[in-house]
From Swiss-Prot:
Gene Ontology MF: a single term: nucleic acid binding
Protein name stated in the entry: Protein RRP6-like 3
Domain HRDC: 350-436
Cited SUPFAM superfamilies: HRDC-like, Ribonuclease H-like
């Protein structure tokens, strides 16, 4: 009995203790929440001093304005003005590309691999000037940087490590931010070689923060690519070449903190200290390879020269701010795709929830800019989805929803040790989310100006800084440019633009609205680099549990399965090169458009393994180079048509009844010149428009001429007014058709039947020789391109143009008239002929011909490393690929 009584007492006491702990925890949590939610009128930045708020001037603020690059004042060449916002040292780098300086050693005498405890911490302006003087006397020095991106919207450089033969220097770029230009001359000196590892981001970060431009660089990562090393990471080189192990998790530490821990100092020194020794070892290997390769005496095949060329190509990169049509639009589209369309269950998110996702993403973007915080520190993607689905109705519920979701997903493990979710921005501005959920701010255009005024207005709750001040000026411009098309309507087309203004309007309308290449990395499970790709592809792997995140800035993943093949094994070095968001022709970086070197009318009919996830033949061009390339392609199409005897346009279209039992809807007999066979959709529409509008008033000879043009399309039979109405819509997209119907002077008596054509015909206009270049670009923009073009076979990447868009031969059997438009039928017959007569080798030769046409027309000077005319394009499909034939069969 005594034992039972004691047990009861113990259980009772334990229960009371547990209840007390739970009560105290809940009390503290509620007290903290009340404290945080009750101080909504006060921003957390009034009590928290962020290191970057000590900067007196920033080159890249958080506004929507374009980043302005350094402009060099050269009196001798003032008349020859360089392109606005171009690379200030492009001339010097081009000289190095043509005449690389590699005849020197990275080491002087014997080198000890032991790293001493001695180093120099540079934190004053006088020390920085002394360092600049020391570096100016060096022939080579090593560089590395440490970044901070979590508590900053654009990120900033927190530390620069520089190593010479004698000493290691750690430069406190937070303390010296405003005077870092002191180092600009030594970094831009073409006579001094700067050694980096994986400098693609370091180069643009130095431009962003300090207007420091690297000229003459040797990148040990590029040397690894040329040598086809199994891994290209610095940790791998440190271990295999120097026998030094490093903890790469330290890269994610908060490099803003001062003083740095001993472990962080040693890590920072290690990255730069051994780079000179590693560079020397790799150049020795490159020279040995060049000696062994006796079959290629030409210097272009010299491995050391190739490594130098790739390194200096990296120097030409230019920093650009990511731009969007509207704040947060890219993030909201990605979230909706991943959590709705990407998983097929459309019941999870209603239309109202989708709109709330857009509002929250726009609000998150603006709050990140105002407070200089990364968007993930403001509000996580998972929290946005949770709020949009649950739509809590009180501030307490909103707070709990965010806290529980972030705790469950642990989306930011690096934050959990310091600050718990919800993060300070949410706690200070919880009322904004409450109003958005209640739909008190119904429109995005209303929401953002109100939030901006509340935060930065005359009586704003948030402090003004060098990072957010420009938002007050540029934000109205951003919103007005977003709304301009709706307000102006058709009036814009009535205005008389000068050539320059018209071109600027065209560029604004059709150029890419955000960087195409994100240069995210995918590694195989053995650590070898497979490819560079965009963020969406990384998310595809991560969401399916096929990969793990190994680096955050820039993002990199490692596959958890064995991929099918390696790029270097297949001779596809192109896919393991970083790509710059510039025109490959002239280097224009302010605007660019995607361009298909091999026209879609051919490529869409290629076998799957010769086109899927292949971006070798998709490049970026500015408007001027795009026009040159397109004109050359149109001329060459005519040569192809003559050579193969297959006309570009359908000679005539048969009734579906007549077509039954025939093997082809296109007449085989050709005229003397096959390029004149058939009717161009543009000429067809022009003739139909003239006949409908002025047919009764025009001279009989002209009327007959136009009738013959339309009759040729319909096979020579008599025409009805209904035929003319249908011809007027040939080759137009559904949007263009509706737009045409609204124009004055055009009425359709058979509008119901004509409108039905929108769903019956979907053709590719990509191949048409349109006089209006805008038509061409409309088709170009309808293509969603995989910007990675990776060498892996897994993942869905980005969508190719579907067959109904590209294939003019895709017809609906219900049509009373079968319509073959554009160059689709021509392309299909060409590819069928090549496969029938020459097999896949014929298709590859055909592709090489088109690449040569492109090179001869544009003379590209900025093509990515590894791009070549003789690229094979072949690939295999792995187990998880949506293009795997066995997988396709199993799903059908």
């Amino acid at each position: 009995m005594e034992l039972k009584e004691k047990a009861k007492v113990v259980i009772t006491v334990a229960s009371l203790v547990a209840v007390t702990i739970l009560f105290v925890t809940e009390y503290r949590r509620r007290r903290q929440r009340r404290k945080q939610t009750s101080s909504l009128s006060s921003c957390y930045l009034h009590s928290e001093l962020k290191p970057q708020f000590g900067f007196k001037r920033v080159l890249a603020d958080n506004s929507y304005s374009e980043f302005k690059h350094l402009k060099l004042v050269d009196a001798s060449s003032s008349s020859l003005e360089k392109p606005s916002n171009g690379h200030p040292y492009e001339t010097e780098i081009t000289v190095l590309l043509e005449n690389p300086q590699i005849e020197f050693g990275f080491l002087r005498g014997e080198c000890s691999l032991e790293m001493s405890d001695s180093y120099v911490w540079v934190e004053t302006e006088s020390q920085l000037k002394e360092l600049a003087e020391i570096l100016a006397k060096e022939q080579v020095f090593a560089v590395d940087t440490e970044q901070h991106s979590l508590r900053s919207f654009l990120g900033f450089t927190a530390l620069i490590q520089i190593s010479t033969h004698e000493e290691d220097f750690l430069v406190d770029t937070i303390a010296l931010h405003d005077v870092m230009s002191i180092l600009r001359p030594v970094f831009s000196d073409p006579n001094i070689c700067k050694v980096f590892h994986g400098a693609d981001n370091d180069v643009i970060w130095l431009q962003r923060d300090f207007h420091i431009y690297v000229v003459n660089m040797f990148d040990t990562a590029k040397a690894c690519e040329v040598l086809s090393k199994p891994q290209r990471s610095l940790a791998y080189l440190l271990e295999t070449v120097c026998g030094v192990a490093t903890n790469k998790l330290l890269q994610r530490e908060d490099w803003r903190q001062r003083p740095l821990s001993e472990e962080m100092v040693r890590y920072a020194r290690t990255d730069a200290h051994y780079l000179l020794y590693i560079a020397d070892s790799l150049t020795t290997e490159l020279k040995q390879l060049a000696t062994e390769d006796s079959s290629s005496p030409d210097d272009r095949f010299h491995f050391l020269l190739e490594a130098s060329r790739r390194s200096n190509m990296t120097c030409l990169q230019l920093y650009t701010k990511e731009t969007e049509d509207f704040p947060g639009s890219a993030a909201s589209s990605s979230i909706i795709y991943r959590h709705l369309n990407g998983h097929g269950d459309k019941s999870n998110i209603s239309l109202n929830a989708e709109e709330l996702v857009r509002k929250l993403c726009a609000w998150r973007d603006l709050m990140g800019r105002i407070h200089d915080e990364s968007t993930r520190y403001v509000l996580s993607d998972q929290a946005i989805v949770g709020l949009s689905c649950k739509q809590p109705t009180t501030t307490e519920e909103i707070y709990d929803t965010i806290a529980h979701i972030d705790l469950a997903t642990e989306s930011s493990p690096s934050l959990s040790s310091s600050v718990q979710s919800p993060y300070p921005v949410i706690c200070s501005h919880l009322d904004d989310i409450y109003k958005m959920i209640l739909d008190k701010l119904a429109k995005l255009d209303d929401l953002l100006p109100v939030v901006l005024k509340k935060c930065l207005g005359t009586n704003g709750t948030c402090p003004i800084s060098v990072f957010n001040y420009s938002l007050l000026v540029n934000f109205k411009t951003k919103l007005s440019s977003h709304s301009a098309p709706k307000q102006n309507g058709h009036k814009n087309f009535k205005q008389q633009f000068t050539r320059k203004a018209s071109r600027e309007l065209f560029v604004k309308k059709f150029s890419c609205k955000a960087p195409v290449y994100h240069n995210c990395r995918i590694y195989a499970n053995d650590g070898r680099l497979l490819c560079y790709c965009d963020k969406r592809k990384l998310e595809w792997y991560l969401n399916r549990g096929l990969a793990k995140l190994v680096e955050e800035n820039p993002p990199a993943i490692m596959l958890l399965f064995e991929p099918k093949g390696r790029p270097e094994d297949e001779g596809n070095d192109f896919y393991i090169q970083t790509k710059r968001n510039i025109c490959v022709g002239c280097g224009e970086g302010k605007h660019y458009l995607r361009y298909r070197i091999i026209p879609s009318c051919y490529r869409v009919h290629f076998p799957e393994h010769l086109k899927s996830h292949r971006s070798h033949d998709i490049v970026l061009l500015c408007v001027d180079c795009h026009e040159v390339a397109h004109a050359a392609a149109e001329r060459y199409k005519k040569q192809i048509a003559t050579e193969f005897g297959i006309p570009l346009f359908v000679r005539r279209v048969l009734d579906s009844k007549e077509a039954q039992g025939t093997s082809s809807l296109v007449e085989d007999e050709s005229t003397g010149d096959s390029e004149d066979a058939g009717v161009s959709p543009l000429h067809l529409r022009s003739a139909a428009m003239a006949l409908l509008r002025h047919g009764n008033r025009m001279p009989s000879s002209r009327r007959e001429e136009l009738l013959q043009t339309v009759k040729m399309y319909y096979g020579g039979r008599d025409l009805s007014e209904e035929d003319l109405e249908k011809a007027l819509l040939i080759g137009l997209s559904p949007h263009e058709r509706r737009k045409l119907e609204r124009k004055k002077g055009v009425s359709f008596k058979h509008s119901a039947e004509v409108a039905g054509m929108d769903k019956q015909e979907d053709e590719n206009n990509d191949g048409e020789a349109l006089a209006d270049f805008e038509k061409i670009m409309t088709v170009e923009r309808s293509t969603v391109v995989d910007d990675s073009g990776d060498g892996t076979s897994e993942g869905d990447g980005a969508k190719e143009l579907n067959d109904t868009q590209c294939n003019g031969n895709t017809l609906h059997q219900q049509n009373s008239k079968l319509s073959l438009l554009g160059h689709g039928p021509h392309g299909k017959q060409i590819v069928e002929y090549l496969l029938r007569e020459h097999g896949e080798d014929g298709v590859r030769d055909f592709c090489q011909r088109w690449r040569k046409v492109f090179v001869d027309a544009v003379h590209p000077r900025h093509l990515p490393g590894g791009w070549n005319v003789s690229h094979s394009g072949r690939r295999d499909f792995g187990e998880f690929s949506v293009y795997n034939p066995t997988k396709r069969l199993s799903t059908e």
